[in-house]
């Protein structure tokens, strides 16, 4: 059995914790909270720390064979970093959460390198010359074998995740599997790799990764939310054939708008909305800031209203 812990969730909190693709039950979540509430309150644990505790407790009680654990933020001080894994994986480094992790790639790489454990192999997905030096130093300090998947992996397999950026992710996956297979605890066969990569969405439930929601008009949903991610997604959008481009846009209130808004194309119609979460930025504030970068459109009372209106106009 395989446990999967990811964050954040899109619609349902239980998306974060799955075994063999099935979400944790509501009963288990409620029992865990009731049982541990005094401890949580006494120690002032964060929402994320409580959720990590829930995931680990669930995986332990269900006796999963393998657990895939995604770090929440950074790595060195993250609640997930109490484990000793079979292999550590660092996918890429972007300027995100800079108020907590530092405002240079080197500072953020240092935090992410904190998941490198003594004598545990580490796979690096993407790197720059600055971040590579930090990863190499940390691996040497821990006597850990280090693998840069973008330099080592040549073969590829088709996947139901079709964003351009998945090329890098697939290389990282293949390198990680090669290391796990070399440890001889169990074997992941090539047929399993092929099937797995063709069924990522079905097996994980992950949504919003260059996800096609419709064909007439073509509708793409992507949850890219930092400069690196947006640059890649917007570049891929420009490769698409279209007569007109309609962008439904909502952000959270701590987003650096002066950094991300200049990335968006001016030749598009914008539908500004507020995500239905406490951290959502008011749509009017977003529209006012977007106008400074010549991104023009209207504000809508909800994401659903903006989405429906964009479809109606695109069909005309």
Give the positions of each predicted feature.
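ATP-dependent carboxylate-amine ligase catalytic core
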Residues: 3-83, 101, 130
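Glycine-rich phosphate-binding loop signature in dinucleotide/nucleotide-binding domains
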Residues: 59-65, 237-243, 310-316
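Conserved catalytic-core segment of NTP-binding enzymes
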Residues: 75-77, 84-143
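C-terminal helical cap/extension that packs against the catalytic core
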Residues: 128-147, 218-220, 261-315
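Short internal beta-strands
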Residues: 5, 121-126, 248-249, 268-276
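Active-site-proximal loop->helix
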Residues: 8-35, 99-116, 122, 136-137, ...
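Nucleotide phosphate-binding/pyrophosphate-handling subdomain across enzymes
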Residues: 66-71, 79-89, 93-97, 107, ...
